[in-house]
Regions:
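Active-site neighborhood of divalent metal-dependent phosphoester/pyrophosphate hydrolases
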Residues: 22, 48-56
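Short, surface-exposed acidic-centric catalytic microdomains
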Residues: 60-61
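Active-site regions of metal-assisted phosphoester/phosphodiester hydrolases
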Residues: 1-44, 68-69, 73-249
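Active-site phosphate/pyrophosphate- and oxyanion-stabilizing loops and adjacent acidic/basic residues
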Residues: 64
Length: 249
């Protein structure tokens, strides 16, 4: 049964938080990230470079710290490991999540990279709509990023997402020239949220490294790059903020 009149607006944020280390002052201040995210009032948050057990970061468990401070459900997968500690991708959600999956995007000997997927159960009227979200962090080399996105769009997890199912893909694509969307994501019917916007470095953004893309029964209502005082200093990237209308049809 369809419910054409029912819809729900959700806010999605994507942000490489640089392990809670400021991009200009080099200060480790998790509270700045928490305060910034709280001000955004997002329903779904895609974070990259979330650290655990790193001595130079007081050995903090940023996964627990952030999720508890914001009162959100969380899913996490470690990516890059050090001798002591590691960091990875995290999805925070105000709504319950299920079907947490990981796609390995590591290419050869290069740094471990991946995509974290979750099904978020968004309330729409008296019903729940499954919104499939993917959080990516791609590599630094151009050829590496191309292979990673080719693997991602061809992976089984994505193939099983129906064309009408709300699908959101976001993260740090390290997209220096803004070319990855047109080459790999738009052919899969994934539209960029908003226009191409610079997000790095945070103090004076010159490169459009980050992006949010979407398809299915979801409509973009608003898009912006975080420009508050905290958004400019809390990390070395600026956050992306997108409001979507999710419908049952």
């Amino acid at each position: 049964m369809s419910h054409p009149s029912e819809s729900q607006t959700i806010r999605v944020v994507s942000w490489n938080i640089h392990k809670c280390v400021g991009g200009t002052d080099g200060r480790y201040e998790p509270r700045r990230i928490v305060d910034c995210l709280a001000a955004f009032e997002a329903n779904i948050v895609l974070l990259q470079e979330v650290a655990r057990d790193m001595p130079r970061l007081r050995g903090d468990d940023q996964v627990s710290l952030l999720s508890e401070a914001l009162g959100m459900h969380c899913a996490f997968h470690p990516e890059h490991r050090f001798k002591s500690g590691y960091y990875g991708n995290m999805i925070l959600s105000a709504f319950p999540m299920s079907d947490i999956q990981h796609v390995d995007l590591t290419i050869g000997w290069r740094k471990i990279r991946g995509a974290l997927q979750a099904h978020v159960r968004v309330p729409v009227g008296e019903h729940r709509r499954s919104v499939v979200v993917n959080n990516l962090h791609l590599g630094l080399a151009g050829s590496e990023r191309a292979k990673q996105l080719a693997r991602f769009v061809g992976c089984e997890l994505l193939a099983h997402v129906h064309a009408s199912t709300p699908l959101i893909v976001g993260g740090d694509l390290n997209d220096l020239w803004g070319s990855l969307g047109p080459r790999f994501l738009e052919p899969e019917k994934l539209s960029r949220a908003g226009t191409l916007r610079n997000t790095f470095p945070a103090a004076l953004p010159l490169r459009p490294l980050d992006g949010i893309f979407f398809r299915g029964s979801v409509r973009l209502k608003h898009f912006e790059v975080g420009a508050s005082r905290l958004a400019k200093i809390a990390s070395d990237h600026r956050p992306l903020i997108a409001d979507f209308e999710v419908s049952m049809s």
